[in-house]
Amino acid sequence: MKTSVLFVIFGLALLFCLSFAAELEDTGRQCGEFMWKCGAGKPTCCSGYDCSPTWKWCVLKSPGRR
């Protein structure tokens, strides 16, 4: 029982560390990808994406958008 609890705790700690590292990698980007927060104080959207005025995240460009 103690061993399985330790495995669960170490597994959760590993998952937390990996997600934190992925988040650091995302914040290091120069531009925002799909569903990335954009707007004032945030990085601009990458080419091929526009900042949605309603939701304030990067969405794919469509022919009807300006």
UniProtKB/Swiss-Prot annotation:
Similarity comment text for this entry: Belongs to the neurotoxin 10 (Hwtx-1) family. 29 (Jztx-13) subfamily.
Lineage per the UniProt record: Eukaryota, Metazoa, Ecdysozoa, Arthropoda, Chelicerata
Pfam families xrefs: Toxin_12 (PF07740)
Propeptide: 22-29
Disulphide-bonded residues: C31-C46, C38-C51, C45-C58
Superkingdom of origin: Eukaryota
Signal peptide stretch: 1-21
Entry keywords, A to Z: Disulfide bond, Ion channel impairing toxin, Knottin, Secreted, Signal, Toxin
GO CC terms: extracellular region
Cellular location(s): Secreted
Protein name per its UniProtKB record: U10-theraphotoxin-Cg1a 1
Free-text comment on this protein's domains from its UniProt entry: The presence of a 'disulfide through disulfide knot' structurally defines this protein as a knottin.
Function field: Probable ion channel inhibitor.
Tissue distribution of the protein: Expressed by the venom gland.
Listed GO MF terms: ion channel inhibitor activity; toxin activity
